[in-house]
C-alpha cells in the first residue's frame, strides 16, 4: 500500500502513531548489532519494540525485510518526510486533517508550533467544538467511530466541527472514505469478523 501511495502524485500522506512506532524501531533494527551498539539498546527501546510487535509490527517487519535495500530506503525516506497535518479549503470551509487529534490544543495556537507527538496519539473530545468558527472542521482517524457514535455503528461521525473517519476496519468494522468536495461517504466491509460490542469496549 505504501509503495502504491508513493507512486501517486495526488496522495498526501499524514503520519500516524503506527508509522511513528515503525520508524522508532526500524532505525535501531537497521544498525548492525555489535558489542558496542548493543550497549545503546535501552529499556525504553525494548518496550517500544514490544509495543510495536503487539500492534501488528511482526507482519510489517516480515514484509519490509523482503524488499530490496533501495526499496526499504525509499519507504523510510517517504515516511520520515510525511507531514503531521494537512489543511484543505473547499467552499469557504477549512479542513484540518490529522491522524489522531491535537493534544494541548488552543484555538489561538498555530499548528506548526505543536510537537509531532501532539498529533499522533491523542483522542479528541468529540462532544466539544475545538474551533469557534463553524467553517473549520477537524478531520481525524485513530479513534474508532463506534466509540464516538451513540448508535455505536462503524460509520463516519460528523458533529461539533469533527469528521471522524476511522470506522474500525481492523476490528471488523468498515474501511471508510470521506469526500470533502461533496460530503459523500464511501465504505468497504472488513474481512474480519463483524464488529462486536466486546471489541468496541476493548478499544476504550
Model regions: which residues?
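A short, highly charged, low-complexity intrinsically disordered segment
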Residues: 191-204
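Extended hydrophobic/Leu-rich segments
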Residues: 2, 38, 114-115, 204
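Acidic, His/Gly-enriched loop-helix segments that form or flank divalent-metal centers
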Residues: 44, 51-164, 168-174, 180, ...
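Core catalytic region of metal-dependent phosphoesterases/phosphodiesterases
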Residues: 1-44
